[in-house]
């Protein structure tokens, strides 16, 4: 005698719900599929859990909305496991003729320092420091620079 799935409606009284319709009820041997492997009990429990969840969703729409919501943010671990090899952009080759060179600006100097520097150029290199100091002392007077005109008015001009 072939045992198959018995399809009949059974009304179960649950405390949360008035009546529940269940399909694929297990027959005499304990599982509903008739092959004797025993996985029918798990299916029966899963079906009851689904029925109870459906009843809870109907009673409480906020819970249903939370249960149906997707995971935020989506979990995608395979992107984090391996580094992504992005081909590098080839560097632009530049001609040495088109590369601009910095323009060297002469520092801002007052007239006294400029004149002293010009006067020092004709002196031997080992005596230039002493000559420059003597030049500043000799020429920094009111006759050469009346009312302080041409003298440094701030530290940056030295």
UniProtKB/Swiss-Prot annotation:
<keyword id="KW-0217">Developmental protein</keyword>
<keyword id="KW-0744">Spermatogenesis</keyword>
<dbReference type="InterPro" id="IPR031397">
    <property type="entry name" value="Soti"/>
</dbReference>
<dbReference type="GO" id="GO:0007291">
    <property type="term" value="P:sperm individualization"/>
</dbReference>
<comment type="function">
    <text>Post-meiotically transcribed gene that has a role in late spermiogenesis; required for actin cone progression during spermatid individualization.</text>
</comment>
<comment type="similarity">
    <text>Belongs to the male-specific scotti family.</text>
</comment>
<protein>
    <recommendedName>
        <fullName>Male-specific protein scotti</fullName>
    </recommendedName>
</protein>
<feature type="region of interest" description="Disordered">
    <location>
        <begin position="24"/>
        <end position="43"/>
    </location>
</feature>
<keyword id="KW-0221">Differentiation</keyword>
<feature type="compositionally biased region" description="Acidic residues">
    <location>
        <begin position="30"/>
        <end position="42"/>
    </location>
</feature>
<dbReference type="Pfam" id="PF17079">
    <property type="entry name" value="SOTI"/>
</dbReference>
